[in-house]
């Protein structure tokens, strides 16, 4: 490409994206939706008081290359295994710039990512990953469970930058990403440098992780092309051919007989059952090999149609590739080879390949062996029990005589200070959250046991709050078997109903396109936060002004209506207000100078 042309295209890209205030407003609208935007970084600022002058100052500092990210504030959150996961809370200005960088990187790399990658990508989730496993892993005999040790903490910065340079020629943009990688973090008021990894909690860490691990995706695609081997014509097994001849003979005899006899019917059914119980193809046929691959963030699984020796070799080859090319290490404890008939834990589900030869009668009356070789997804029993115990909804004790577990619903004292409608709403959201995650599991109906326990926990919580018993609560609020709690609004009395929609299994994890809000409803609105700040109209007094800023609160629930800001927010049912400097000065709100 001509250098002058490349430089010209780079200038256009910078004007349209990196130096464009409209792009920053779009990024601001994205991060404003998150409650994390109101979390303070090391500078003590939040998204509150965002304005166009503040955005223009950020753009100018990026243009003249004086922009310097602040170190992240380190916090620790508990992991499932009892250990702690470090999170980096970045400053508000850094969150905004990182969102801009994320959108640019996503536009460049998203079309090139593998279809087998599902983590941190638009319109993809754990459900799409599991649905792909269910569809593509049919008939696999061995499964390689892959886990990368401390993946996000061990990304090599130099390797990441070299990967970025393959697609991006703008060194200033890469330099900006390098600054974020080297920004460091504050812990116990002490600054610490970062020599590797991308901080979890950073706006660019998910896209950087996918760019880094897409090399593994590409490697597995090349490996699959070399490994897969399928003969032009696969031979049927001798057992199946023999059973087929017996079935055809029995069927011909039954159809040709003037009158069916019990012996002919029995022979026909037995021969059909024998035929359906045999393999059509030999699953261990010499020369027939295939692998399937699926990744979500740093977790991946590889399905192998082949021998255990093949699976062990694939595991070792992947380990060597990660060490030599990406400078990452696989966890020896968590990375293992498992037979497909045994449950494999992946993304909170258990899955295994069914080897049952049982048959099922279809709608047209034919008998089919519908399960053999299929992948089934299961909800682990301990998951919903653990959730209920963590929330204090049940108490599990073991009977000393029989050794059996005794489950007892318990009132939740942490919810008793809330209103009745809030208590029911909290239980509803917890039930729906668990069901929505496990809705594609074969045994999702097992949540009825969870529902029974949680329902009585909710009734006991209401009874404990009102110092009565469960029978009184039922008699007071139960209507046609559904518990309804009344609450008053400005439009009259309404009712909050306890969840009663059941736990129907969904066929796959892909959302219905019909449920997606049309773009003209989603974006083309004068009430969006971007249009409100650009309109230049103060939402307190209605005056036009060039200098508007956005005032934010974390939740509407925390507002008491003590001043004009809170009264207006409660009236508009919004967590943000576009206001002018006059009100900021008079109400002692901090605001950055022009």
Regions found by a protein language model. Name each.
Residues 2-13:
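Single conserved hydrophobic/aromatic residue that forms the stacking wall/gate
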Residues 31, 60-83, 92, 96-104, ...:
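Reverse-transcriptase-like RNA-dependent polymerase core
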Residues 115-116, 121, 128-321, 325-329, ...:
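Conserved polymerase palm-domain catalytic core
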Residues 305-314, 323-325, 345-536, 575:
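Active-site and adjacent loop segments of nucleotide-processing enzymes
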Residues 538-541, 580:
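Short cysteine-rich clusters marking metal-coordination/redox-active sites
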Residues 542-543, 584:
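Cys/His-coordinated zinc-binding microdomains
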Residues 544-576, 592-594:
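Histidine-centered nuclease catalytic patch
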């Amino acid at each position: 490409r001509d250098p002058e042309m490349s430089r010209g295209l780079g200038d256009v890209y910078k004007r349209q994206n990196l130096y464009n205030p409209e792009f920053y407003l779009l990024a601001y609208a994205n991060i404003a939706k998150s409650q994390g935007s109101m979390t303070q970084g090391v500078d003590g600022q939040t998204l509150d008081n965002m304005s166009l002058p503040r955005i223009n100052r950020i753009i100018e500092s990026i243009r003249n290359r004086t922009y310097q990210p602040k170190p992240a504030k380190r916090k620790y959150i508990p992991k499932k295994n009892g250990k702690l996961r470090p999170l980096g809370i970045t400053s508000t200005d850094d969150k905004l710039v990182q969102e801009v960088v994320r959108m640019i990187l996503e536009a460049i790399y998203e079309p090139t990512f593998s279809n087998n990658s599902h983590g941190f990508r638009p319109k993809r989730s754990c459900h799409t990953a599991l649905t792909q496993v269910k569809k593509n892993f049919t008939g696999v005999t061995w499964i390689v469970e892959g886990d990368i040790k401390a993946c996000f903490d061990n990304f090599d910065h130099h390797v990441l930058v070299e990967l970025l340079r393959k697609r991006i020629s703008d060194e200033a943009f890469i330099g900006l990403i390098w600054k974020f990688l080297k920004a460091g973090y504050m812990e116990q008021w002490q600054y610490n440098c970062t020599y590797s990894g991308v901080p979890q909690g950073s706006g660019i860490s998910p896209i950087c992780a996918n760019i880094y691990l897409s090399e593994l995706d590409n490697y597995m695609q090349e490996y699959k092309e070399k490994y897969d081997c399928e003969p032009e014509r696969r031979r049927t097994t001798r057992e199946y051919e023999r059973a087929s001849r017996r079935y055809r003979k029995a069927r011909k005899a039954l159809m040709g007989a003037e009158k069916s006899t019990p012996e002919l019917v029995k022979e026909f059914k037995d021969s059909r059952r024998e035929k359906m119980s045999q393999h059509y193809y030999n699953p261990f046929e010499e020369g027939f090999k295939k692998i399937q691959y699926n990744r979500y963030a740093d977790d991946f699984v590889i399905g192998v149609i082949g021998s255990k020796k093949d699976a062990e070799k694939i595991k070792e080859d992947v380990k060597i590739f990660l060490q030599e090319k990406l400078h990452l290490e696989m966890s020896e404890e968590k990375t293992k080879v498992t037979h497909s008939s045994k449950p494999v834990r992946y993304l909170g589900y258990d899955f295994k390949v069914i080897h049952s030869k049982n048959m099922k009668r279809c709608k047209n009356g034919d008998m089919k062996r519908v399960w053999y070789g299929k992948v089934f997804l299961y909800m682990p029993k301990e998951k919903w029990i653990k959730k209920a115990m963590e929330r204090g909804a049940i108490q599990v004790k073991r009977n000393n005589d029989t050794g059996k577990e005794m489950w007892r619903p318990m009132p939740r004292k942490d919810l008793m200070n809330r209103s009745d409608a809030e208590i029911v709403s909290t239980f509803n959201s917890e039930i729906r959250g668990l069901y929505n995650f496990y809705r594609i599991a074969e045994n999702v109906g097992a949540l009825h046991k969870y529902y029974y326990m949680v329902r009585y926990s909710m009734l006991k919580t209401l009874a404990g709050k009102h110092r009565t018993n469960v029978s009184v609560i039922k008699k007071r609020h139960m209507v046609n078997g559904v518990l309804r709690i009344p609450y008053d609004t400005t439009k009259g009395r309404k009712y909050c109903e306890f969840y009663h929609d059941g736990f129907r299994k969904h066929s796959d994890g892909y959302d219905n396109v019909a449920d997606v809000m049309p773009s003209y409803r989603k974006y083309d609105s004068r009430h969006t936060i971007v249009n409100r700040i650009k309109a230049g109209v103060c939402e307190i007094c209605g005056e036009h002004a060039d200098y508007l800023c956005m005032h934010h609160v974390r939740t509407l629930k925390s507002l008491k209506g003590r001043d004009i800001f809170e009264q207006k927010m409660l009236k508009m049912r919004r967590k943000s207000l576009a206001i002018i400097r006059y009100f900021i000065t008079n109400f002692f709100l901090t605001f950055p100078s022009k």
